[in-house]
Every structure is written in C-alpha cells, then in structure tokens.
Amino acid sequence: MKKIDEKLGVEFKNRKYIEEALTHPSKSKNNYQRLEFLGDSILDFLVGEYLFKKSDKSEGDLTVLRAHFVSEEYLSECFDKLDVESELNLGKSLQGKVTRAIKGDVFEAIIGAIYLEKGIDFTRNFIIEKLNLENFENVENDNYKSELQELVQANFK
C-alpha cells in the first residue's frame, strides 16, 4: 500500500484518481479540477443527507450547518488533519505556498477520487469520520434569519 493510501485509509487500485486529486493545475493539465467538481457535489449531498437524517432542525438551520461543514475554511482544516500536504504535486510557483483555498479544493478532489474508487457507502463513512459530522450539535448556529423569524412569531401572534 502506498503512503498516501495509508494516510487516507483507502487503497487505490486505480492510481490515476488519487494522483489527479493531488495535482494542482499549475503542474499538469491532468489535475484535480474535475475531481474537485465531483467531490464538491458529493460532499453537499452526503453532508445534507446526514444532517437531514440525524437532526430535526429547520431547513434554514440545516442549510447553515451544511454550509459550515463544506466551507473552504473547514475543509482546509480537515485537509490538514489528513497530513497529505507533502504528497501534493504543485507547480514551481506554488512550492511552499499551499493556500486554504487549495487545501479545500484538494480535499474535495480526494472525496471525488474516493467515490470513483470505492463507491458511495465507503465515501459516506469517510466523510462522516473526517468531517466529524457526528458532532454537528456542537456547531455554532449563525442562522439569524430563523432566529429573527422565531422571535417575531413568538412576540407578535
């Protein structure tokens, strides 16, 4: 098993998926952008599905929670925990300059690669674990619109 496979806990038989997921556009035309597109869609779906099934929160609150878990900032933190930055294939201009945006993009691309390699169920479990979705109740709720609506409804009935 390759080092990256061990870090991710995924054995890639088709090396092309993970190699592209770790390759920045500045390095090659065979890069992470298409996998990022796929991973972004899968993340939105699986995080939304998980929150819908595990919570009875309102649509607005669920939207805020999902936005937190798929945000560039949060995905960048999750990328750091994977400890795979040394595996990135970057153009010379980016050596030592891996931004939060790149980390988030690569995390999404890794999700796309895992999905293509292992399917939806494996990907779902990977996302639940790596995004720590089980602790969604501990995420601050900044859904001010819902809070205002509830306040108005409670006071002006």
Where on the chain are the PLM-derived regions?
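Double-stranded RNA-binding/processing signature
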Residues: 1-157
